[in-house]
A protein has these predicted regions:
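C-terminal and late-domain segments of enzyme folds
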Residues: 436-440, 444-535
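Active-site proximal loops enriched in glycine and acidic residues that flank catalytic Cys/His/Asp
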Residues: 9, 39, 213, 240, ...
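A generic structural signal for well-ordered coil/turn residues at beta-strand boundaries
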Residues: 1, 205, 232, 292, ...
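Cysteine-nucleophile active-site neighborhood
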Residues: 18, 22-26, 30, 345-440, ...
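Short acidic-aromatic active-site loops that bind/stabilize oxyanions
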Residues: 108-119, 302, 356-363, 434, ...
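Short low-complexity, flexible loop/linker segments enriched in glycine and/or proline
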Residues: 50-53, 224, 395-398, 499-501
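Flexible phosphate-sensing "switch/lid" loops adjacent to ATP/NTP-binding sites
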Residues: 1-328, 335-351, 358-359, 366-372, ...
């Protein structure tokens, strides 16, 4: 029987529920269990795909093309499994489906209500991911905070699920803040007491509590919380701020967090094998403390919020760890970058990366960054829009097409070297309609891309509407812009790079390789980019 673990949060949001859940997933997998993960988001958006990165951070894309919450990126990186669209759902998606079914007549004229219809639909999502993956353990994180009005149907659903699946197959973990009051020189337990009281008012008694704090929590504080919440003291854990999110599994393992979960669910506490994770942590510590610094300038549009580029930043650090280099990522506001200040801003960068994005704002600054990288022989990695930027800059400054651009930004430009995909013609809906998910890419032998991957055919995830305009392909290639990867039929250009006699390492891809990088297995493009930047 599949075991279900539900992770809720209390007091405030952004506590680290996702990291706690992902760490548990890693620990259970290290004990030999098949683990999958899921995020339930109570907001009314159907998915995060159209949400502003300033509000929600990056949109993570799964292999099967779902635009998901960034926590799925944490899940994939920690448990090293590819998740699917079944691993993330929202209130908006639940209601959209229910209303469509009601309009279709599926409820035979019955009154459609939150209980049982909404809660049943939510529980069907729990069962669905279990059936799809055949996992031993499903870990579901409930977004938001206990007490939020929009989250109440989800809380009711996880309460009911204990009866549906059997009490022995369900575990409730509550992550709560224990704030430190500087004036009093002590941590306060009252917020957690009230949070658990709120949770219990919905009929859920937590089995395990995880206390989040930026200060050390003494055993007497744990005992106090255990007493007030009716939770065994050995099931009250502390998760203090760590040097890195990747240190959290080790911190929790030292407290036997996963052992208590196994005991609660009747799972055989198999021996834990964390050798690969410990090896990664040792390499990371060595790279950060003793490795040569490698400064990467990430030129973007949403640089005020690093989470907007979370997977890119993590992929750079994975590569640095693998190579024994201390990667320093500097976020550069593309909107503020110009010919007048580019030397001052990018002059000390070992490498320049232009990530994905949408809209014209900051486009000119990204063009400036690509030009600087090309002219000054600075290693360059372009991702999605970053590839389009590289193509536009080359067409402008090498071919001499001063107005070369993307039809996304200038529909009337004479030289649209980046144009709308044929399949996007006539598409008016914004949500979930782009070219999404994994597509094959055939690499050209002898190119930097082919050497990085070491394979002739690779799969990468995509999220875009616009593509390289092949009408300019011959002209661009003649001038030195090599097409190094295409769709298997050769129709779509997926990767480009500068000829080696023009630049030592200048590679750009229409895909989002950052989504497939793992702590113990860095993505080859990021690995070779950092290697080139370190030389």
């Amino acid at each position: 029987m599949t075991k279900h673990i539900f992770v809720t949060g209390g007091v405030v949001s952004s506590l680290g529920k996702g990291i706690t859940a992902a760490s548990l997933g890693r620990l259970l997998k290290s004990r030999g269990y098949r683990v999958t993960m899921q995020k339930a988001d109570p907001y009314l958006n159907v998915d995060p795909g159209t949400m502003s990165p300033f509000q929600h951070g990056e949109v993570f894309v799964t292999e099967d093309g779902y635009e998901s919450d960034l926590d799925l990126g944490h899940y994939e990186r920690f448990i090293d499994e590819n998740l699917t669209r079944d691993s993330n759902f929202t209130t908006g998606a639940i209601y959209q489906d229910l209303i469509a079914r009601e309009r279709h007549g599926d409820f035979l004229g019955g009154t459609v209500q939150v209980i049982p219809h909404v809660t049943n639909a939510i529980k069907a999502k729990f069962r669905g991911v279990e059936e799809q993956t055949d996992a031993d353990v499903v870990i579901t994180e409930l977004g938001g905070t206990i007490g939020d009005i929009e989250g109440q149907p989800f809380v009711e659903a996880i309460r009911q699920y204990k009866k549906d699946a059997g009490a022995e197959n369900v575990c409730y973990i509550h992550v709560s803040l224990v704030p430190y009051i500087a004036a009093a020189h002590e941590v306060k337990t009252k917020p957690t007491q009230h949070s658990v009281k709120e949770l219990r008012s919905f009929g859920i008694q937590p089995d395990i509590i995880v206390l989040r704090s930026d200060h050390h929590i003494e055993d007497d504080v744990r005992a106090k919380i255990a007493s007030f919440t009716d939770v065994d003291v050995d099931c009250v854990f502390t998760c203090e701020d760590a040097p890195s999110i990747y240190d959290v599994p080790r911190m929790m393992a030292e407290q036997d967090f996963d052992l208590r979960v196994c005991e609660r669910l009747g799972l055989d506490p198999r021996e834990r094998d964390m050798a690969d994770w410990e090896g990664f942590l040792a390499a990371k510590d060595h790279a950060e403390n003793e490795g040569d610094p490698v400064k990467i300038a990430l030129v973007g549009k949403y640089t005020q919020l690093p989470d907007a580029y979370l997977s890119v930043i993590e992929a750079l650090h994975h590569a640095g760890t693998h190579l024994g280099k201390h990667v320093e990522v500097e976020l550069v506001d593309g909107e503020a970058l110009s010919d007048d200040n580019v030397e001052q801003v990018l002059g000390d960068a070992s490498g320049i990366l232009v990530p994905g994005g949408f809209g014209k704002r900051a486009f000119d600054g990204k063009i400036t960054a690509a030009r600087y990288a090309r002219e000054h022989q600075v290693p360059y990695l372009g991702i999605c829009l970053g590839m389009q930027v590289a193509v536009c800059e080359f067409a402008r400054d090498v071919l001499g097409y001063a107005d070369a651009s993307s039809s996304e930004f200038d529909p009337q430009c004479a030289h649209a070297v980046i144009d709308l995909l044929d399949e996007q013609e006539g598409v008016t809906e914004k949500g979930g309609t782009m070219r999404l998910g994994a597509y094959p890419c055939a690499l050209v032998a002898g190119t930097l891309a082919a050497e990085a991957y070491g394979e002739a055919l690779v799969q990468e995830r995509h999220r875009h509407r616009y593509e390289f305009n092949s009408a300019y392909r011959e002209e661009l290639e003649t001038a030195g812009l090599v097409v190094s990867g295409t769709s298997p039929d050769g129709e779509l250009v997926e990767m480009v790079e500068l000829r080696r006699d023009l630049h030592p390492w200048f590679v750009a891809t229409q895909a989002h390789p950052e989504f497939k990088s793992r702590p113990t297995r860095p993505h080859p493009l990021f690995r070779e980019f950092v290697r080139a930047a370190a030389e």
